[in-house]
Regions:
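Conserved SAM/SAH cofactor-binding pocket of Class I
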Residues: 104-204, 230
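Conserved AdoMet
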Residues: 2, 35-111
């Protein structure tokens, strides 16, 4: 009896066409990443072994991933990992998936301080710990705290903390914004945050990938600025003199967040950091000394 043979090349071609029919943005790349995950090989391996037949067990693990991807689940949530700042983080469908935009925030802080600076960092709305752990990885004498209201996110953050062996320099706590710090008298050199900032009215234009991520990690109220208002008011209480704040913002929110910081009257040196496309995606400031 004839048994159909699926090679690496053939399955990738089929998957690309299938994802194209679903109008997915990166059909070829998605298929390659999912197959690499199943085979536990890098993507280069796929091209150097194009004619390699796949085992039935490999096909059985690959097909459900393709189906779930077509339903709108992100590749990262399906593979359980996401690369960020040259590091590989654990993720799942209960956390915000790290995006390249956020690297602009991390790179700004890394360029502001030296490796030997023993700074203390607070990461508000830490999610899977991506920002804080990246900073601690590249600033080997820094320490930090990550706060988040989501227990599911903190579970993944702790997993990443252990993977990078940063237990001695980082801590994660469940907290509704600054509530944890109300009982802990501590000041920080830096407060970073990538808070929820999508406007509620923009929900209808979001891709299925994004809508499958946790609601509480995405939306920042009617105008998207709800969390920035609280950050602007509260950060001054927990920063050392001339301490730094650095917030990721939506593509059109930089001026609005700047205005919020100005209205508080406690910040100086308010400025922007742009992404590779020249869009201001980070707002930074210093608290008055």
């Amino acid at each position: 009896m004839y048994k159909e043979i699926w090679t690496i090349g053939r399955i990738l071609q089929w998957t690309e066409q299938y994802f194209q029919s679903k109008e997915m943005d990166t059909p070829r790349l998605d298929g390659e990443v999912l197959l690499s995950h199943v085979l536990e090989k890098n993507r280069i391996y796929l091209y150097t072994n194009y004619d390699q037949p796949l085992e039935q067990e490999e096909l059985d693990r690959f097909r459900p991933l393709v189906i779930e991807r077509a339903k709108g689940h992100s590749v990262a949530s399906l593979t359980g990992t996401k690369d960020f700042m040259g590091l590989t983080f654990a993720v799942n469908d209960k956390v915000l998936i790290p995006r390249p935009d956020t690297e602009t925030l991390v790179e700004y802080v890394l360029h502001t301080y030296h490796q030997q600076d023993s700074i203390r960092i607070l990461d508000m709305c830490t999610g899977p710990g991506t920002i804080l752990l990246s900073l601690l990885h590249y600033l080997p004498t820094a320490t930090g705290m990550g706060l988040d209201i989501s227990r599911d996110a903190l579970e993944i953050a702790t997993k990443n903390q252990e993977a990078f062996k940063l237990e001695n320099r980082s801590e994660f706590h469940e907290s509704d914004m600054f509530s944890y710090l109300e009982d802990h008298n501590e000041l920080f050199d830096v407060i970073v945050s990538n808070p929820p900032y999508i406007r509620l009215e923009d929900k209808k234009i979001l891709s299925p990938d994004v809508l499958n991520e946790p609601y509480i990690a995405l939306f920042g109220g009617e105008d998207g600025l709800e969390f920035y208002r609280q950050l602007a008011m509260e950060c001054v209480k927990y920063l050392k003199p001339y301490g730094l704040v650095a917030f990721e913002v939506g593509y059109d929110q930089a001026e609005d967040v700047k205005s919020l910081l100005e209205s508080v009257g406690s910040y100086v040196d308010i400025s922007f950091a742009a992404d590779l496309a020249g869009i201001n995606r980070v707002v930074t400031a210093r608290v008055k000394g």
